[in-house]
A protein has these predicted regions:
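Domain-terminus/edge residues, biased toward the C-terminal soluble/receptor-binding domains
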Residues: 174, 187-417, 427-443
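Short amphipathic alpha-helical segments
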Residues: 12, 147, 302
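Glycine-centered small-residue hotspots that permit tight backbone geometry or close packing
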Residues: 91, 120-122, 408-412, 418, ...
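Active-site-adjacent loops and short helices of periplasmic peptidoglycan-processing enzymes
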Residues: 25-205, 216-219
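Sec-dependent N-terminal signal peptides of Gram-positive bacterial secreted proteins and lipoproteins
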Residues: 2-25, 412-433
Length: 443
């Protein structure tokens, strides 16, 4: 019985700690995390950098070496796709516009040293099909055809890439080429003037998360091209091709996770194995970047990167959830009645009570943690005071209403604790009665 009491007390304590303890992802060992997720792990393959962010706000939920400069390899193509989607949105291009393949395009598609698909001189390729070819089989030829649709000056296009990176706040990113393959691999068919043909592009996990978050929110149609494990291009024509995704975290792929719907992989001798995953399920909208997994000499790295990435993503999903913090309507704060004009919902740590700050006729949620960029912040809602708004405290204590919301949102944990406590009391009561019966028998 003593052992039971000790064990049960420990369980209850752990349950309570699990409810109130904030997540500290930066202190988690990635190798152990991946092992515990059931994957075979070689510590030498550990990612050099990784990040997971809330795609609504830019709040960082997981980070490891996020500002280390790395070669993104073919992930660079996401910026080219971004510029094309922006040109379409601005009316400069159209999604069904056709690009006629040149002799040079066909020659580039036949270069074995870089990733490609079959491009045939004289064939008209719709921009939408070229986008699929760029994002899934990672075709360098298709990427350059898209870049040339914006400008035939390859150097000016790279200049546009760098300008857009600066505009988005990608402060540690520099492009030397449009596709992620160094220009010297193109056998003279591609060489942006003024850019080093032997140097790879440079970026960081943070910067790629900024780019992915922006393209996910601004141009969600891109995810329609990346959300399937198998993709067909030029379907119904003599040039139809079928491609299996390299993003093995997509549902239906080798390490598929429900909710993953993009975005791009990349690998090179300089940068090893990398990928960006986008996730959207149960209103959890996330961007994950994993860089520098394994070594180029072992091509299994294209699978291994997803074991680490999946373990990290699942860790975040276990510790965070999308919740309604404050519903639209009238609320009572310490006797002051105010009305919010909309419901406030967001991604928050499980088991953590969000604090609110009332200031300048707004309710601001206060959450710990960094953001991708300095101008990003936690969401807020406008309020209309029905009484005493000016007297509301700027730093309110945890209120009765907050606790009530918290209890509802953590009903299962509280049910376990309350139920367990009742069971514990019943066991003690039963033991007490048993002792009395034993004493009576001795008499």
């Amino acid at each position: 019985m003593k052992k039971f009491k000790k064990y049960f007390g420990t369980v209850l304590l752990l349950l309570l700690i699990g409810i109130v303890k904030p997540v500290e992802a930066e202190n988690v060992d990635i190798v152990e995390l991946t092992k515990n997720a059931g994957y075979e792990v070689n510590p030498a393959n550990k990612p050099k950098a990784s990040i997971v962010v809330d795609a609504y706000t830019g709040r960082i939920l997981w980070q490891d070496n996020i500002d280390e400069v790395r070669d993104p390899a073919s992930i660079s193509k996401v910026m080219t796709v971004y510029l094309v989607m922006e040109a379409i949105a601005n009316g400069e291009l159209s999604i069904d516009q056709k690009i006629t393949a040149t002799k040079e395009d066909q020659a580039i598609s036949n270069i074995y040293a870089i990733s490609n698909n079959k491009i045939v001189e004289g064939v008209e390729y719709p921009i939408e099909e070229l986008l699929k070819m760029t994002l899934v089989p990672s075709s360098n030829a298709a990427t350059l055809m898209l870049a040339n649709a914006i400008t035939n000056d390859s150097a000016k296009f790279v200049e546009k890439m760098n300008a857009k990176a600066k505009e988005l706040g990608m402060n540690h990113t520099y492009f030397n080429n449009a596709s992620g393959a160094v220009a010297e691999l193109f056998q003279g068919y591609y060489n942006p003037e003024g850019y080093d043909a032997s140097k790879p592009n440079q970026t960081t996990a943070r910067d790629l998360a900024i780019l992915a978050m922006d393209i996910m929110n601004r141009f969600p149609k891109v995810l329609e091209y990346t959300n399937s494990a198998v993709v067909k291009t030029m379907e119904g024509t003599p040039y139809e091709e079928k491609f299996d995704t390299y993003n093995y975290s997509l549902p239906g792929a080798k390490y598929g996770i429900e909710g993953v719907n993009g975005l791009k992989t990349g690998s090179s001798g300089y940068g090893a194995f990398n990928y960006i995953a986008t996730y959207d399920k149960d209103q959890m909208k996330l961007v994950e970047v994993v860089l520098g997994v394994g070594d180029w000499s072992n091509q299994d790295g294209e699978f291994i990167r997803h074991t680490f990435g999946n373990a990290i993503l699942n860790y975040v999903l276990e510790h965070f959830s999308y919740r309604t913090i404050l519903s639209a309507g009238e609320h009572n704060f310490d006797g002051h009645k105010i009305t919010t004009n909309k419901t406030l919902s967001m991604i928050v740590e499980k088991g953590k009570i969000p604090e609110w700050q009332v200031e300048n006729k707004k309710i601001n949620v206060k959450l710990s943690g960094d953001f991708l960029k300095d101008n990003q912040k936690n969401p807020s809602v406008d309020v209309v005071a029905e009484s005493g708004f000016a007297d509301l405290p700027k730093e309110p204590e945890k209120r009765k209403q907050t606790l009530q919301v918290y209890i509802v949102q953590n009903a299962f944990a509280f049910a376990v604790i309350i139920g367990g406590s009742i069971l514990f009391i019943l066991v003690l009561f039963g033991e007490s009665r048993a002792k009395k019966r034993r004493k009576q028998k001795r008499k």
